[in-house]
Amino acid sequence: MNSFLKRVVCATAVAASALALAACGDDEGESSEPTPSSAESTELTPVKLQLQWFTQAQFAGYFAAVDQGFYEDAGLDVEILEGGTDIVPQTQLAQGRADYAIAWVPKALQSREQGAGITDVGQVFQRSGTLQVSFKDKDITTAADLKGKKVGNWGFGNEFELFAGMTKAGIDPGKDVTLVQQQFDMQALLKGDIDAAQAMIYNEYAQVLEAKNPDTGELYKPEDFNRIDWNEEGTAMLQDAIWANTEKLESDKAYQDQTVKFLEASFRGWIYCRDNAEKCRDIVVAKGSKLGASHQLWQMNEINKLIWPSENGIGIVDEAAWDQTVQVAMETKNAEGATVITKAPEGLAYTNDYAEKAVAALEADGVDPNGADFEPIEVQLEAGGA
């Protein structure tokens, strides 16, 4: 029995020399094609998933879905394509080099406005993971406190929550702060070159906690820093989502069915990581993560906090969060005066249809897609994230 697809395979001996396998009806009594677990369906459908960065626990759910056989149970042979500084995942998807892609919502919406035919079918991250981090003695606790400071940001479309937060606080980002192009690390903050640094709570923030405090010889502690959380400031934008090919969603029945299967298997991977953080850390490390085991466990724990609880079910787009993301993307200008998008998204920018079917299948199988009782674990970081 393949509980993933909610089917039952019935075996009937029809002759002494042959064994015929027929797929019985599903729970609703409807007939269906044989499942991937039947003897008649041994071939898996190849699927390519494009990540937006290098292998790390940010993507643990997908690696877990491969490792635990969830994709295979769904009849899918999923190849995970690593990202990097020169790879735009939504472009890879739009150009047919991948079947699905992981991308932040505002960046993907910008690509849509430029012509990419992509749709958000699974909003995995329910909350933003972006922070602005400063040493405690700088007394920067809100966006308003950034006035007159040297403020680091990565640019490349990552800066809009920061700019929206400053604008909301009455700060002109072009005049009231000194903007500093920040590398994707925390060295400028640790060296004192900037007063506040952009950081992901699951990555760069951990890096400062993995560094030694020269005054004590011990690792820095959370109480050594202040953090501005854009979720609390009201300018957060939706981040990691699963994007699919819009044209295929609208015209290709096989792709539509595949998308439900892919989402359900991916969600199972994330649920597995919710309940087995250490095991998912091990999966990611074994896949060749650039940073070490303690860093990946921290990252796994923080990623879980961004996903769980999922009030409406994992992958379901929250309309209020979507609307806030679109508003910030349309109205907030960066240092060059540009916005992420110039108008509200048109067409099928997102749909909950496929995620809702995947969540319903999980619930029917007794799997919790909400994680209302999720509790994070305690993580002890080591020097350098070892």
Ranges and model annotations:
Residues 1-11:
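Bacterial N-terminal signal peptides that target proteins for export
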Residues 33-182, 186-191, 195-201, 222, ...:
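Short, glycine-/small- and polar/acidic-enriched structural segments
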Residues 19-23:
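C-terminal motif of bacterial Sec signal peptides marking the signal peptidase cleavage site
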Residues 25-28:
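Bacterial signal peptide processing site
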Residues 323-386:
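Conserved C-terminal helix/tail region of periplasmic/extracytoplasmic solute-binding proteins
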Residues 106, 138, 184-187, 194-290:
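Pocket-lining segment of extracytoplasmic ligand-binding domains
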Residues 252-338:
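Secondary-structure end/capping motifs
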Residues 10-18:
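Hydrophobic helical h-region of N-terminal Sec-dependent signal peptides
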